[in-house]
């Protein structure tokens, strides 16, 4: 099975982190468990790194990069950019929660969205 991103994530090398999260699906912890895309290369239409796709565009309501959306606002409890949220999006791979996408440093097994983008966008 997939090991939990046993952290701190900072102990991982960038390569290791990107390998672990590659292919993970991002699921919100809202009542609908809204799909927020996949952690895959930017050519994948479902990728959070595809700026023209549903999940990578800063204009899409289901994109974490839309700062005015439920899932991108730093004030929304479901957003990975909310540094105080206890309900950030889950990273799910092979049917298991492997970690969380969150700017809240108190969340175990989490990586901040901007860090994930900086480390992995060009590696996947």
Would you name each region that the model predicts?
Residues 14-124:
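Repetitive, compositionally biased segments used for assembly/scaffolding
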Residues 1-2:
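Sec-dependent N-terminal signal peptides
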């Amino acid at each position: 099975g997939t090991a939990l991103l046993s952290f701190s994530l900072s102990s991982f090398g960038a390569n290791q982190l990107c390998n672990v999260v590659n292919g993970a699906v991002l699921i919100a912890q809202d009542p609908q468990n809204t799909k927020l895309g996949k952690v895959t290369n930017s050519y994948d239409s479902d990728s959070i790194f595809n700026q023209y796709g549903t999940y990578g565009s800063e204009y899409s309501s289901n994109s974490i990069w839309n700062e005015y959306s439920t899932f991108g606002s730093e004030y929304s409890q479901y957003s990975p950019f909310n540094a105080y949220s206890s309900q950030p999006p889950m990273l799910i791979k092979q049917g298991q929660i492997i970690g969380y996408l969150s700017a809240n440093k108190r969340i175990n097994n989490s990586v901040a969205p901007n860090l994930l983008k900086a480390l992995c966008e060009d590696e996947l």
